[in-house]
């Protein structure tokens, strides 16, 4: 469960960060 959550976060957070800061 934990590795899956870490993998999901690794995909999710960069996209959110990209939208907020507009630095991709």
UniProtKB/Swiss-Prot annotation:
Q: Which cysteines are joined by disulfide bonds?
A: 18-24
Superkingdom field: Eukaryota
User: Which InterPro entries does UniProt cross-reference here?
Assistant: Antimicrobial_frog_1
Which family, according to UniProt? Belongs to the frog skin active peptide (FSAP) family. Brevinin subfamily.
What tissues is it present in?
A: Expressed by the skin glands.
Segments spanning the bilayer are none
Example of a GO biological process term: killing of cells of another organism
UniProt entry keywords in alphabetical sequence: Amphibian defense peptide, Antibiotic, Antimicrobial, Cytolysis, Disulfide bond, Hemolysis, Secreted
Any one GO cellular component localisation term in the record: extracellular region
- Specify whether Transcription regulation is a keyword of the entry: no
Check the record and name the Pfam families matching this protein: Antimicrobial_1
Please give the function described in this protein's UniProt entry. Answer: Shows antibacterial activity against representative Gram-negative and Gram-positive bacterial species, and hemolytic activity.
Report the locations given in the UniProt record.
Secreted
Name this polypeptide is given: Brevinin-1Ecb
